[in-house]
């Protein structure tokens, strides 16, 4: 079976749309999705500007909770929590963290992990693993590393999509992305300017 490792910042709406696309892909292609946290807060450390507009460091909180969920409860729990973050709120951004933990069948006390630095090393290590695969910090979230059954690995940033395709459209985007990203020498492809993400 093909494995798609997804590195995601849980607060990024475009990444959530990409995650929904991968959930669709696994319905129509033999793909296992594995979840890994990364952090835009880590990515943007030391920059003069703050492209995320997060001077208070709020974006650390959901990333830390994801790291705690992954370390203490595993992959399936992380997928459930990440999904609940985006499906228990208003739909345009992540919902209440405790509500999402409860909806995912996880202890709501895990929300406390977001308020301290105890999981920062876990976040940083997972983030560094994804960034190392893509070869530097010239990209953001998400990073996808696809390992095919023959062992060949294709790594790419994105795709950044505003709407999650379903069914055969999801499969076509998957097949095309692997074809393009797996071409020796391929670096970048961009489409039209971004639309607001359709997160529901």
Residues covered by each model-derived region:
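Structural alpha/beta surface segment adjacent to cysteine/selenocysteine redox centers
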Residues: 10, 16-97, 176-180, 188
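C-terminal cap of thioredoxin/glutaredoxin-like
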Residues: 21-23, 93-200
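Residues at structural and domain junctions
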Residues: 8, 51-52, 116, 163
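Extreme N-terminal starter segment of soluble prokaryotic enzymes
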Residues: 1-5
């Amino acid at each position: 079976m093909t494995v798609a490792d997804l590195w995601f910042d849980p607060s990024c709406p475009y990444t959530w749309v990409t995650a929904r696309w991968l959930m669709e892909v696994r319905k129509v292609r033999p793909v296992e999705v594995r979840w890994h946290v990364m952090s835009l807060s880590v990515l943007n450390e030391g920059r003069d500007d703050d492209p995320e507009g997060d001077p208070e460091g709020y974006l650390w909180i959901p990333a830390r909770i994801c790291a705690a969920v992954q370390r203490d409860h595993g992959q399936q729990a992380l997928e459930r929590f990440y999904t609940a973050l985006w499906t228990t709120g208003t739909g345009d951004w992540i919902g209440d963290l405790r509500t999402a933990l409860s909806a995912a069948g996880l202890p709501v006390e895990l929300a406390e992990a977001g308020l301290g630095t105890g999981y920062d090393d876990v976040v940083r290590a997972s983030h560094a693993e994804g960034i190392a695969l893509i070869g530097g910090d010239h990209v953001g979230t998400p990073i996808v590393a696809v390992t095919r059954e023959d062992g060949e690995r294709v790594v790419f940033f994105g795709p950044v999509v505003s709407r999650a395709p379903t069914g055969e459209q999801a499969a076509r985007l998957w097949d095309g992305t692997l074809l393009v990203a797996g071409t020796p020498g391929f670096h970048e492809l961009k489409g039209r300017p971004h639309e607001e993400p359709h997160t529901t």
